[in-house]
Amino acid sequence: MESTPKKAPRSKFPALLVVALALVALVFVIWRVDSAPSTNDAYASADTIDVVPEVSGRIVELAVTDNQAVKQGDLLFRIDPRPYEANLAKAEASLAALDKQIMLTQRSVDAQQFGADSVNATVEKARAAAKQATDTLRRTEPLLKEGFVSAEDVDRARTAQRAAEADLNAVLLQAQSAASAVSGVDALVAQRAAVEADIALTKLHLEMTTVRAPFDGRIISLKTSVGQFASAMRPIFTLIDTRHWYVIANFRETDLKNIRSGTPATIRLMSDSGKTFEGKVDSIGYGVLPDDGGLVLGGLPKVSRSINWVRVAQRFPVKIMVDKPDPEMFRIGASAVANLEPQ
């Protein structure tokens, strides 16, 4: 009976090779994930401002629509300028009337100034006469006891002294009156400065009735129309600053050790995942609100952990500036995927 030939033992080398390659691939994936962190917990964002009128009034022109793109300097809306034009005309009329009053008063003051100079000279003369009369009376009164002068001489000295004092008081009143007339022009000049300040402020208010775009952007949340009364410092709509877009990507705290300001990044938006955008890390968040009952600090962003029943790494927001964003694709809140390439 013929014996069946034994099969040659299979080589274990291919299987070991497959296992080795799988281990190498696993190690590479782990290294890659650790050295080049990635997250799909990210969203696009940009800076925004509330567009507010700085003066109150009725909207007479609305040059934009909701979601419209605008350029810096484009007209957004215009407040009714007529009340402010009337205020400006009134202030300018007040200035013209005041200038005329100052001119007429100045002529009067010039004449009174000449009189004031004369009065000042009279004051000095009257003051000298009063002093002389007082000195004469002071010398005369002691001589009466010695009999060198008569009582009539003393009475005449006293009368002369009182008359000199009265003359001095009269010319002093004249001097005060002349001085007050001169100072009247100074008051009018000060009043003119106040009117000029009012005119400057009114012109500024008139300029503020026209509101223009402070930068390139996009209009959102527009809910008004022509005829609506706009109150000063009350928002009309929001303007997105489309010059600078960035992505807020929430990375695990274990990924932060290799992330620095300036770390290169690639961004993909969920709206078109086939298109990538280059960017760089701008900054890393230094505080988030805990979601496990810890201390809560106002103003901190809240980033939820993906698993609540297992102690997992907290996530911190990383701000990534996009180099050349597509203004038609980027929207605030759009979902994104961020990949970092630490050097």
Swiss-Prot record:
The chain crosses the membrane at residues 13-33. The keyword Transcription regulation does not apply. Its main location: membrane. GO terms for biological process: response to antibiotic; xenobiotic detoxification by transmembrane export across the plasma membrane. It holds the Pfam family CusB_dom_1. Gene3D superfamilies: 2.40.30.170, 2.40.50.100, Helix hairpin bin (1.10.287.470). Signal peptide: none annotated. InterPro entries: CusB-like_dom_1, CusB_D23, MFP_Efflux_Pump, MFP_proteobact. Keywords: Antibiotic resistance, Cell inner membrane, Cell membrane, Membrane, Signal-anchor, Transmembrane, Transmembrane helix, Transport. One of its GO terms (cellular component) is plasma membrane. One of its GO terms (molecular function) is xenobiotic transmembrane transporter activity. It comes from the Bacteria. Residues 1-12 are cytoplasmic. Residues 34-343 are periplasmic. The keyword Cell inner membrane applies. It is found in: Cell inner membrane. It is a single-pass type II membrane protein. Could be part of a tripartite efflux system composed of MdtN, MdtO and MdtP. PANTHER family: MULTIDRUG RESISTANCE PROTEIN MDTN, P-HYDROXYBENZOIC ACID EFFLUX PUMP SUBUNIT AAEA-RELATED. Belongs to the membrane fusion protein (MFP) (TC 8.A.1) family. Could be involved in resistance to puromycin, acriflavine and tetraphenylarsonium chloride. This is Multidrug resistance protein MdtN.
